[in-house]
Amino acid sequence: MLAGCQPGYMSTASTNEQASAAGPPPAADRASYRDVLGVGEFRVIFTADIVSMLGNIVAEVALTVLVYEQTRSPALAALVLGLSFMPYLIGGALLGATADRLPARRVLVGCDLASAVLVGSMVIPGIPVPGLLALLFANGLIAPVYQGVRSALLPQVLPPGPRYVLGRSLMRMVAQSAQIVGFGAGGLLLAILSPRGALTADALSFVASALVLRFGTALRPVRAARSGSMARDSLAGLRGALAHRPTRRILLFSWLVPACAVAPEALAAPYATHIGLPARAAGFLLMGIPAGTIAADVIAARFLSSRRQRRIIVAAGLLTFAPLTAFAASPGLGLAVVLLVISGLGSAWAAGMDGLLIDTAPSGLRNRTLALAGAGLMFTQGAGFALWGIAGQYASLTVVIPVAAIAGALAVVTLRPHPRP
């Protein structure tokens, strides 16, 4: 499960604001997905990202089945998914300086090859379950490095502005779609191959991604040589980003809002049984938010100017949570899916936050701030899954989901970005 945000600055000239409100955004503030995909290097990164993302998801599915077949333990099988989130905290904190210390292409290719070796090692016959989990955890440490370096590379391939926002939009849409396609592909592979066969195919996919990146991206030198250890440099960058108040607010908004928004997904299976349906009906619920999110990204990134993207951040954030309060009334499956799609539409706030983070990050720390944003998002989403899942065991789902919605709305209002004068 892999799985991104920021605000913009409004002009104080009222005449400019009126002109913007009255007519379409100027050409300089518009771009299309065709423009973005017309950049060859972005296409390469985009393709490799799809392959790596699907590979990680398929690995989780196959390894979950493999662990369960060996142990018949639901707890250990569930631990596989938990371990996919935990390394983000460690990797993001201790390896966040990678983007500033090593050439991006070298890191991305190295990450894919390391993942190929680790996933390939999982197919060794007779390897004990603790060994499988250790390999999964090690592979999980690579993911935040890969995503952080890729995030830092993107503004160099797509300069900050409309194209960058659209590029980030495409990445988010792929992340949402990969959740659905990846689990389906994993199930299909397991229907054709054994779990070890699926893992072998996954290892080969990482090799393919490495080759695409090696021959499709430019070798960019690092901006400046740095001394000291990687961990110390990473922690210094972490402190620097969080010490900058505007950046800290953006990061906290981008982490806490999604952490609350995942509550209905974390409780999808229990909610399905709560309304009298089999647990497998959770699949319909799980499609709701990703569907809304994809639509929101297309609308916000493609059809709204940068200024309007940033103006709707708070309203869109509140839209994320308003529909979730209706779960207090135990809506049926059809209405619940509609509510979740509307909640997903609220994720339009992310388009505005993308540009804002780029504009706000402290000088010299942009790469590490972008890496931190991605790692923190994945970790807090995982923590949100765990928190709301545990809460659902001890309290009614008709209470837990609305409480998560209220907490999320409070985060939106409390951490709302302040535009520059």
Residue ranges and their predicted role:
Residues 2-421:
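Alpha-helical transmembrane-bundle signature of multi-pass membrane transport and export proteins
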